[in-house]
Design a protein with these regions (language model features):
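ATP/NTP phosphate-donor binding region
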Residues: 1-85, 310
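C-terminal charged capping/lid subdomain of soluble metabolic enzymes
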Residues: 2, 170, 286-326
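A glycine/threonine-rich phosphate-anchoring loop and its flanking beta-alpha core
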Residues: 7, 103-195
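Structural motif
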Residues: 8, 30-31, 84-87, 108-110, ...
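Short glycine/serine/threonine-rich phosphate/pyrophosphate-binding segments
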Residues: 16, 39-43, 93-99, 118-122, ...
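A short, small-residue-rich loop immediately preceding and capping a beta-strand
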Residues: 78-101, 105-116
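Active-site segments that bind and position negatively charged phosphate/pyrophosphate groups
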Residues: 185-299
Length: 326
């Protein structure tokens, strides 16, 4: 079985308000799951709006990460309070935790991304970490979220750094899937690869404009945030596990074992992993296309203030066998 997309998607400037009639049909006792203090105001709005719909609303926050300690604690909250859905409102870790908890307890999940930093609001996948942010594994879930609310006004309040991170993460879709899946004889997978190529081209064209015009909510910005949060998720939905991870994300997972990950966003680390992946490709058979891709990506990544080297992530490869770990 393959879950390709959320059952219902609301997108645009008033997506949250438009979603409310559908949410109240789905749930009577939702749990709003969040984490960071920077998104408190938005979560409070979500809480008030649901209360005004006469729902019995509870709230809970992750203390650490999308980790088993937090998941177990929130599972207990859900069971003790007869919660019938989870509304995950936040970044990738919150969205992944909400999806995982809903999957474990067989209740609907509603994802409300509050930044464009990942496509986690779309996918039937959760990445599990230790409470210190070290990657453990990814878990394929039974289905994508029941409802995805991609409200541009919510996302517009996020720091521009989160958009830069989302661009780096989404760019990796093409470079990874073209390696892992290019020879697979599966029509859907091949179509996913082609979508990821168009996604890459759009981000190379609009990415820097969007980063500089976040508070204008113009066409470049709208196209880019939807590319990061929606189209990137569609690639994973259509391509499935065959379009998931090559060196860029594998390097990210290794780097989380070394550094204090709360200093860096997921896509910031993936971006460095992507450059290293392309460097490895360039070294193999003297691949000139990989070298050209590095030059092209370096221009954009510097415009987006993204780290481009392991050293910029605070790693000395000559200490503690760090190079071997990566």
């Amino acid at each position: 079985m393959q879950s390709i997309s959320p059952e219902t998607i609301f997108r645009g400037n008033d997506a949250w308000q438009k979603s409310l009639p559908h949410i109240i049909k789905l749930t009577k006792s939702p749990l709003i799951l969040g984490r960071g203090i920077h998104t408190n105001n938005l979560r409070n709005k979500i809480f008030r709006d649901l209360k005004n719909q006469n729902l019995n609303v509870k709230c809970a926050n992750l203390r650490f990460d999308c980790c088993y300690e937090d998941i177990s604690r929130i599972n207990n909250i859900v069971l003790k309070n007869n919660i019938d859905s989870v509304i995950a409102a936040g970044g990738g870790k919150v969205l992944d935790a909400g999806k995982y908890i809903s999957d474990c307890l067989d209740i609907p999940c509603i994802t409300v991304p509050l930044s464009a930093s990942t496509c986690a609001g779309w996918t039937a996948l959760s990445n599990i970490y230790t409470k210190y942010g070290q990657f453990i594994k990814d878990v394929a879930l039974g289905s994508c979220p029941k409802i995805l609310v991609y409200d541009h006004k919510f996302i517009q309040t996020a720091p521009s750094r989160t958009l830069a991170s989302g661009i780096a993460d989404a760019l990796a879709k093409w470079y990874e899937s073209s390696i892992t899946s290019s020879k697979i004889d599966d029509g859907l997978v091949q179509q996913a690869i082609q979508i990821s190529r168009v996604l890459r081209d759009q981000l190379l064209i609009d990415g820097e404009k969007a980063f500089r015009s976040q508070f204008e909510n113009n066409l470049s910005w709208r196209n880019t945030v939807e590319a990061c949060g929606l189209t990137a998720g569609l690639v994973g939905g259509i391509g499935g596990e065959k379009c998931r991870t090559a060196a860029a994300h594998a390097i990210h997972n290794a780097i989380t074992q070394i550094i204090t990950t709360n200093k860096f966003l997921h896509g910031e680390i993936v971006g460095v992993g992507l450059l290293l992946q392309l460097r490895l490709e360039g070294m193999k058979n003297n691949n000139k296309l990989a070298d050209q891709s590095i030059k092209q990506l370096l221009v954009l990544m510097k415009q987006l203030n993204l780290p481009t080297t392991i050293a910029q992530l605070g790693i000395n490869v000559f200490e503690n066998n760090n190079l071997e770990k990566i």
